[in-house]
Amino acid sequence: CSEGVGYYNYGFRAYILLREEVYRATQGKIDFFQTPKFVRIARYGKKIQMNEGVCPAYSDCRIGLSPDRFILSYCDRALGVTSAEEQPVLPKGNNLSLHLLELFTSRVAKVGMTDGIRQVLQEESDALRAYYEQSVIFIARPAGGTSCRLAISAKGGTNAENHNHNDVGSYAVALGSETMVGDQGGPNSYPGDYFNGDAPQKYKIKGSFGHPVPVVDGRTQSSGCLLYT
Protein backbone atom coordinates (compact mmCIF):
# COMPACT_ATOMS: atom_id res chain seq x y z
CA CYS A 1 0.00 0.00 0.00
CA SER A 2 1.70 3.21 -1.15
CA GLU A 3 -0.39 5.18 1.36
CA GLY A 4 1.37 3.52 4.28
CA VAL A 5 0.58 2.00 7.64
CA GLY A 6 -2.23 4.38 8.59
CA TYR A 7 -4.48 3.29 5.74
CA TYR A 8 -3.42 -0.33 6.24
CA ASN A 9 -4.60 -0.20 9.85
CA TYR A 10 -7.87 1.42 8.83
CA GLY A 11 -8.74 -0.69 5.79
CA PHE A 12 -7.38 -4.10 6.70
CA ARG A 13 -8.88 -3.95 10.18
CA ALA A 14 -12.33 -3.63 8.59
CA TYR A 15 -11.53 -6.47 6.18
CA ILE A 16 -10.62 -8.72 9.12
CA LEU A 17 -14.04 -8.15 10.65
CA LEU A 18 -15.73 -8.88 7.31
CA ARG A 19 -13.73 -12.09 6.97
CA GLU A 20 -14.71 -13.28 10.43
CA GLU A 21 -18.41 -12.52 9.96
CA VAL A 22 -18.63 -14.22 6.55
CA TYR A 23 -16.53 -17.18 7.73
CA ARG A 24 -18.81 -17.80 10.69
CA ALA A 25 -22.03 -17.20 8.75
CA THR A 26 -21.01 -19.79 6.14
CA GLN A 27 -19.46 -22.17 8.69
CA GLY A 28 -16.07 -21.79 7.06
CA LYS A 29 -17.22 -22.44 3.50
CA ILE A 30 -16.23 -18.92 2.43
CA ASP A 31 -12.90 -17.59 3.67
CA PHE A 32 -11.63 -14.32 2.20
CA PHE A 33 -8.14 -15.16 3.48
CA GLN A 34 -7.87 -18.42 1.58
CA THR A 35 -5.62 -17.01 -1.14
CA PRO A 36 -1.85 -16.54 -1.43
CA LYS A 37 -2.45 -12.80 -1.97
CA PHE A 38 -3.87 -12.54 1.54
CA VAL A 39 -0.60 -13.87 2.97
CA ARG A 40 1.33 -10.98 1.41
CA ILE A 41 -1.18 -8.47 2.79
CA ALA A 42 -1.12 -10.11 6.21
CA ARG A 43 2.68 -10.04 6.42
CA TYR A 44 2.85 -6.38 5.37
CA GLY A 45 2.32 -5.23 8.95
CA LYS A 46 5.53 -6.91 10.05
CA LYS A 47 7.59 -6.46 6.90
CA ILE A 48 7.02 -2.69 6.58
CA GLN A 49 8.68 -2.17 9.97
CA MET A 50 12.28 -0.99 9.81
CA ASN A 51 12.81 -1.76 13.48
CA GLU A 52 10.12 -2.98 15.85
CA GLY A 53 7.30 -0.44 15.82
CA VAL A 54 9.16 1.95 13.48
CA CYS A 55 7.87 2.40 9.92
CA PRO A 56 8.72 4.79 7.08
CA ALA A 57 6.15 7.58 6.80
CA TYR A 58 5.72 7.78 3.03
CA SER A 59 2.86 9.61 1.31
CA ASP A 60 0.11 10.63 3.75
CA CYS A 61 1.15 8.17 6.46
CA ARG A 62 1.75 10.17 9.64
CA ILE A 63 5.18 9.82 11.19
CA GLY A 64 5.20 7.68 14.31
CA LEU A 65 2.44 5.31 13.19
CA SER A 66 3.01 1.58 13.50
CA PRO A 67 0.94 -1.48 12.57
CA ASP A 68 -1.97 -2.19 14.90
CA ARG A 69 -1.05 -4.88 17.43
CA PHE A 70 -4.41 -6.55 16.97
CA ILE A 71 -3.87 -6.90 13.22
CA LEU A 72 -0.40 -8.38 13.74
CA SER A 73 -1.64 -10.84 16.35
CA TYR A 74 -4.71 -11.79 14.33
CA CYS A 75 -2.74 -12.48 11.14
CA ASP A 76 -0.12 -14.51 13.01
CA ARG A 77 -2.82 -16.66 14.56
CA ALA A 78 -4.76 -17.04 11.32
CA LEU A 79 -1.59 -18.25 9.60
CA GLY A 80 -0.49 -20.42 12.52
CA VAL A 81 2.87 -18.70 12.99
CA THR A 82 2.58 -18.01 16.76
CA SER A 83 2.26 -20.13 19.87
CA ALA A 84 -1.11 -21.00 21.36
CA GLU A 85 -0.50 -18.64 24.29
CA GLU A 86 -3.40 -16.21 24.75
CA GLN A 87 -2.36 -12.62 24.01
CA PRO A 88 -5.40 -10.35 24.41
CA VAL A 89 -5.13 -6.81 23.10
CA LEU A 90 -7.02 -3.94 24.69
CA PRO A 91 -9.82 -2.99 22.27
CA LYS A 92 -9.89 0.23 20.26
CA GLY A 93 -12.61 1.77 18.14
CA ASN A 94 -16.37 1.44 18.53
CA ASN A 95 -17.26 -1.92 16.97
CA LEU A 96 -18.47 -4.52 19.49
CA SER A 97 -17.68 -7.47 17.21
CA LEU A 98 -14.07 -6.39 16.89
CA HIS A 99 -13.89 -5.70 20.63
CA LEU A 100 -14.86 -9.29 21.42
CA LEU A 101 -12.46 -10.68 18.81
CA GLU A 102 -9.57 -8.72 20.31
CA LEU A 103 -10.34 -9.94 23.81
CA PHE A 104 -10.54 -13.60 22.76
CA THR A 105 -7.74 -13.98 20.24
CA SER A 106 -7.79 -17.79 20.39
CA ARG A 107 -11.10 -17.65 18.46
CA VAL A 108 -9.39 -16.52 15.26
CA ALA A 109 -10.38 -18.73 12.31
CA LYS A 110 -7.31 -20.52 10.99
CA VAL A 111 -6.43 -20.37 7.30
CA GLY A 112 -6.36 -23.74 5.56
CA MET A 113 -2.83 -24.37 4.29
CA THR A 114 -2.32 -24.95 0.57
CA ASP A 115 0.87 -25.30 -1.44
CA GLY A 116 0.39 -21.76 -2.75
CA ILE A 117 -0.04 -20.29 0.72
CA ARG A 118 2.97 -22.21 2.07
CA GLN A 119 5.08 -20.94 -0.82
CA VAL A 120 4.16 -17.30 -0.17
CA LEU A 121 4.79 -17.72 3.57
CA GLN A 122 8.29 -18.92 2.70
CA GLU A 123 8.84 -16.04 0.28
CA GLU A 124 7.70 -13.52 2.91
CA SER A 125 9.95 -14.91 5.67
CA ASP A 126 13.06 -12.78 5.00
CA ALA A 127 13.87 -11.13 8.34
CA LEU A 128 16.49 -8.75 6.92
CA ARG A 129 14.73 -7.04 4.03
CA ALA A 130 11.47 -6.41 2.23
CA TYR A 131 10.75 -5.08 -1.24
CA TYR A 132 7.37 -4.06 -2.64
CA GLU A 133 7.60 -4.10 -6.41
CA GLN A 134 4.43 -2.15 -7.24
CA SER A 135 5.02 0.72 -4.82
CA VAL A 136 8.83 0.38 -5.15
CA ILE A 137 9.50 0.53 -1.42
CA PHE A 138 12.59 -1.14 0.05
CA ILE A 139 13.25 -1.95 3.72
CA ALA A 140 16.57 -3.18 5.17
CA ARG A 141 16.76 -4.20 8.84
CA PRO A 142 19.57 -5.16 11.22
CA ALA A 143 20.10 -8.86 11.87
CA GLY A 144 18.64 -10.22 15.07
CA GLY A 145 21.08 -10.99 17.87
CA THR A 146 23.56 -8.30 16.80
CA SER A 147 24.42 -4.90 18.27
CA CYS A 148 23.42 -3.12 15.05
CA ARG A 149 20.28 -0.99 15.44
CA LEU A 150 20.42 0.85 12.10
CA ALA A 151 17.63 0.32 9.54
CA ILE A 152 16.90 2.07 6.27
CA SER A 153 14.10 2.43 3.75
CA ALA A 154 13.89 4.03 0.31
CA LYS A 155 10.97 4.74 -2.02
CA GLY A 156 10.82 4.89 -5.79
CA GLY A 157 7.65 4.50 -7.83
CA THR A 158 5.95 7.37 -9.63
CA ASN A 159 4.37 10.72 -8.82
CA ALA A 160 0.92 9.45 -9.81
CA GLU A 161 0.26 7.24 -6.79
CA ASN A 162 -2.49 7.53 -4.20
CA HIS A 163 -1.82 10.34 -1.67
CA ASN A 164 1.47 10.99 -3.47
CA HIS A 165 3.82 13.77 -2.37
CA ASN A 166 5.90 14.14 -5.57
CA ASP A 167 8.76 12.57 -3.64
CA VAL A 168 10.38 9.91 -5.83
CA GLY A 169 13.65 9.02 -4.12
CA SER A 170 12.51 9.72 -0.56
CA TYR A 171 13.96 7.67 2.28
CA ALA A 172 14.04 7.09 6.03
CA VAL A 173 16.81 6.08 8.43
CA ALA A 174 16.02 4.66 11.86
CA LEU A 175 18.31 3.98 14.80
CA GLY A 176 16.58 1.73 17.28
CA SER A 177 13.14 3.15 18.03
CA GLU A 178 13.85 6.60 16.57
CA THR A 179 13.61 7.84 12.98
CA MET A 180 16.76 9.93 12.72
CA VAL A 181 16.29 11.44 9.26
CA GLY A 182 14.06 11.11 6.24
CA ASP A 183 10.47 11.52 5.09
CA GLN A 184 8.30 13.60 7.43
CA GLY A 185 5.06 11.89 6.42
CA GLY A 186 1.62 13.42 6.01
CA PRO A 187 -0.46 15.96 7.94
CA ASN A 188 -2.65 15.22 10.96
CA SER A 189 -5.65 16.60 9.07
CA TYR A 190 -6.42 17.60 5.48
CA PRO A 191 -7.23 21.20 4.46
CA GLY A 192 -10.17 21.50 2.06
CA ASP A 193 -7.94 22.07 -0.97
CA TYR A 194 -5.28 19.52 -0.03
CA PHE A 195 -6.07 17.32 -3.05
CA ASN A 196 -6.24 20.14 -5.61
CA GLY A 197 -3.76 20.20 -8.46
CA ASP A 198 -1.71 23.06 -7.00
CA ALA A 199 -1.47 21.55 -3.51
CA PRO A 200 2.17 20.36 -3.91
CA GLN A 201 3.19 23.99 -4.46
CA LYS A 202 0.94 25.44 -1.75
CA TYR A 203 1.64 22.86 0.96
CA LYS A 204 5.34 22.02 1.23
CA ILE A 205 4.59 18.79 3.10
CA LYS A 206 2.82 17.51 -0.05
CA GLY A 207 5.51 18.50 -2.55
CA SER A 208 9.10 17.41 -3.05
CA PHE A 209 10.39 20.69 -1.54
CA GLY A 210 9.35 19.36 1.88
CA HIS A 211 11.07 15.99 1.41
CA PRO A 212 14.65 14.69 1.49
CA VAL A 213 15.04 14.74 -2.30
CA PRO A 214 17.12 17.06 -4.50
CA VAL A 215 15.84 20.34 -5.93
CA VAL A 216 17.53 20.35 -9.35
CA ASP A 217 18.21 23.74 -10.96
CA GLY A 218 15.66 25.32 -8.65
CA ARG A 219 12.87 23.02 -9.82
CA THR A 220 10.88 20.57 -7.71
CA GLN A 221 9.38 17.30 -8.96
CA SER A 222 6.22 17.41 -11.06
CA SER A 223 3.10 15.31 -10.65
CA GLY A 224 2.27 12.41 -12.95
CA CYS A 225 3.45 9.00 -14.06
CA LEU A 226 6.25 10.30 -16.31
CA LEU A 227 8.45 10.76 -13.24
CA TYR A 228 9.38 7.31 -11.98
CA THR A 229 12.17 5.06 -10.81
Model-derived regions, located:
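Active-site/binding-pocket entry motifs
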Residues: 146, 220-222
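Conserved active-site neighborhood of enzyme catalytic/cofactor-binding cores
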Residues: 186-220
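Carbohydrate-active enzyme catalytic cores, enriched for enzymes
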Residues: 10-180
